[in-house]
Amino acid sequence: MLYHPNENNYSGNNLSAEIQKVKIKTSDNLELLGWFHEKDLEKFKTIIFFHGNAGTLENRIYKLNRLKDLDVNFLIIAWRGFSGNQGKPTENNLYEDGRSAVRWIKNYGVEDENIVLYGESLGTGIATEIAQNNNFAGVILETPFTSMVDAAKKFYPYIPVKLLLRDKYENIKKIKNIRSPILVMHGEADQIVPFAMGQKIFQEANNPKFSYFTKNDDHMMEFDEKLIGQLNLFLKSLN
């Protein structure tokens, strides 16, 4: 119900960013696929991108092609069970996958103060979990939810989802534990995660915090000039 690794909404975009395919080892001995775009580790921050609950890395090419135009390095990791990776996706397993990506980039020579965690939809749950009580440069949350139980209630209002759903991703309980600057992005037209959830996450977040809220964006936000401009402003504020 929650994880859809085989969903394909790949639009056919060609990857214009120069990337290195890397293998990221987890503590339970899985090797996960990652794409790494290195521009300048000393001059620029490094984004670790945690994607949502559906599709492959190719589904994010349109975003990566825009990120490459910013003064930033980035690593996007594919979850276990996604993009040909072995393993079963669960809440705790994806937390381990995310931490493995952080370990990989730190072993590559990037310190916490130069790492920006970027969560997309489900990935906001991993970014929020990992950012707690740490000193990362920043956190970006695109279409965040308050908890997976809250999000599921929209689609299953007559089912006791709190009892049935094992993976709860309780972002709202963790957001206060994040000390890093936060950018929350959400569109009012989101048909999957209600816009009010993004507003609530922003309200509960500590300062410094920034928002990019739009009228017309659905769940997967348009990576247009306005959004890229907001990302650029946020990244520059971290220097």
Task: Label the predicted regions.
Residues 1-25:
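An N-terminal hydrophobic leader/cap segment in hydrolases
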Residues 27-104, 108, 113:
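Membrane-embedded segments
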